[in-house]
Curated annotation (Swiss-Prot):
It catalyses: tRNA(Val) + L-valine + ATP = L-valyl-tRNA(Val) + AMP + diphosphate. The keyword Aminoacyl-tRNA synthetase applies. The gene is valS. HAMAP family: Val_tRNA_synth_type1. It is found in: Cytoplasm. This is Valine--tRNA ligase. Belongs to the class-I aminoacyl-tRNA synthetase family. ValS type 1 subfamily. One of its GO terms (cellular component) is cytosol.
Amino acid sequence: MDNKNISTTYNPKEFEERLYSNWQEKKYFTPVIDKSKKPYTIIMPPPNITGKLHLGHALDNTLQDMLIRFKRMQGYCTLWLPGQDHASIATEVKVENELLKEGLYKKEMGREAFLEKVWEWTDEYRERIREQLKKMGCSADFTREAFTMDENLSKAVRHVFVKLYKEGLIYQGNRITNWCPKCQTALSDAEIEYEEKEGNFWHIKYPVVGSEEFLEIATTRPETLLGDSAVAVNPSDERYAHLVGKMLKLPLTDREIPVIADDYVDVEFGTGAVKITPAHDPNDFEVGKRHNLPQIRVMDDSGVINHLGGKYKGLDRYEARKQMVADLEELGLLVKIKPHTHNVGTHDRCGTVVEPIISKQWYVKMQSLADPAIEVVRNKGTKFVPERFEKTYFNWMENIQDWCISRQLWWGHRIPVFYCKDCGEIMVELEDPTKCCKCGSENIEQDKDVLDTWFSSALWPFSTLGWPDRTDDLEFFYPTSTLVTGYDIIFFWVARMIFSGIHNMGETPFDTVLIHGIIRDAQGRKMSKSLGNGVDPLEVIDEYGADALRFMLVTGNAPGNDIRYIPERVEAARNFANKIWNASRFVMMNLDRELMDKYKDCQEYSLADQWILSRTNSLIKEVTENMEKYELGIALQKVHDFLWTEFCDYYIELVKPVLYGDDEKAKGVVFNVLYTVLNTGLKLLHPVMPFITEEIYTHLSTETESITIATWPTYDEALNNEKAEKDMTFIMEAIRSLRNLRAEMNVPPSRKAKVMAYASEEAKDAFINGGAYLEKLASASEVTFLDNKDNLDNNLVSVVVKGGELFLPLLDLVDREKELERLNKEKTKLEGEILRVEKKLSNERFVSKAPEAVVNEERAKGVKYKEMLEAVLERIEALQ
């Protein structure tokens, strides 16, 4: 501790890296299991190894770090376990694209050679992510870091797959899947981005066999007509009742298909007749099952028409569409083409339009897994913060479909299913078989597909702690405490972790799910590569420091709500850090440790001392309660307001006369108060601004070697001083009001003036005891107290405050004639501006043609000018 030897300026580059290295060296983030302490565990949502971290990661990890640092200081045995996700398809696409730059093709390389390249990528990007998290100040235990493809996590994946298979919950079946024709794999819903695009409805005639009649259908995908198995109408639709059971000639083919009746059809939508293509549409698939229709798949894995497509065989789906529409028109079967805006799903990694296609995949039966996961949330075994996101969770879980877990990729956990090529036996065991368990043949091969990335991610809370082995970490730290994540993956990840935890561990994996929103740009747009509005958190850290970025991400952040990234707010955060630095340096440069020790038990406090100590105590209670309720943004705002305004702007300024004076005892008392308040403030600020608080604390405090392991302040009801807080509230309002009054009258702070105060009974003590504070902070030459307001000089201007009324003599402050002249000029100018705005807004052409934002801006100007004019008129009246 060396309170004098601290840098004169706040420069985070000087200490952030040094401090983090010291934290790691001292193993502050690596918990040793201590059963005398309560565990508090957060398992970090694993970022994908596909590139650098973005602002969303910075927000997610800042919130987690706040909670971990808070609980660590509260004395919990805290574990924040970091890691990364192998991100199967995302990583495979990235590596493929990199290899293409070298002229290398995945399929030509072969599986093993390609996977070697992926592991090289993995090692590089895991290290990058690790370093980025450290730069953000994340107090995670990197000695326990996990990766979804680690040996033990792969072992956990194998155990769960085998368990589910033997329980009859994993099966292989033909169902509709989201298919990427470019990557040639099934996709999860999370890997699809939907965008509104202009398209068409093609209205096509389907002739009724043996009749002159036809049925008109409308479709956005005419190329799938080749796989139609029926046309459906609603059973209540009288227009088509006579056609139900009849056969239709399927255009462009030599097949006939039936007209069926099904409640799925919306009478009001389109023509009320719907082509049913069970192999190419999820809704049609369900209709087809109900009516036992054939599933005719007319596209191959690359989106090209297959051998069932007749003359269109070998054409890409869009080329086939073009040719088929032309042929339909030539045959007189194309009724019309109607423009139509609809949502089109594309693969988020390669941008290819996704094709719903029937394919043979591995699935998990979900109903029996979902039911207990619904109950645990309903019974508050796991709580969502905010609670409204329970509806999102229930909505998905109560309408859950079986989960497609196979992917036609190379990178990932290979499906542990083995086939005997001689007798067809299927083997699913914990160890790879060497021969067929049925016929003894050694001619066996493993399923070529890999598991959906979310399969391994679903096991993250317990696989990272050593499961399926009963490790000490698993016994002590599971179930975990809080999961912090975005609302966009409640379905894909949160729900799957809950049912996986219950099914494999017998209990929910976490007590609380803290949901945050996404980060948008200043205009409220989602950040994306296409918009070019993304922000690299490391660039922000390089310019402003990690603390400023963290502060900006948390202030104003309410659970579940999106936040906007506004560069000026990061600058404001850095200004706050700078103010804390300068105030702390001022305190430390003036502290006399000997006098502190000499008078540490002296409690001859001034009103300001009593007030700031009481406010500090109240702040401890409020901030602790906010943190416990996950109101992290509110907690931070309170600490900010206290340190900036109450401590820096008021208390430090009020005690400067004591610091510069000769009263040794008064100095000793103030030194102790300054130390106590600053030390406490640093601790309350530490969870969100770890670097600056550590650097100041190590120069200031003698408690512990690091604020990281310091004790969180505790509230002491005995330290409450309501009277001091109330009295200082009167004084501070008086100071603010006097400053505002002087500013309105253009009086410089250097010009002192007498203040006369008429105080109510409850405020008398405050003004008597705090008169010196008005002199110090409100430029009062002296303060006198009035018993009544009778016979007051007309040459006074007054302001009403809570607790009384304050009077200033005009002659002491302004040249009345000059000020009236200035105000009248201002009045004329404002009247002109108001006239200009009103004229503009009365112009109908301007209001109708100008952008709405411009019109609103003019209206706002008009309101502002009128308010300013009103204030000027009041001031003129006062001077006259």
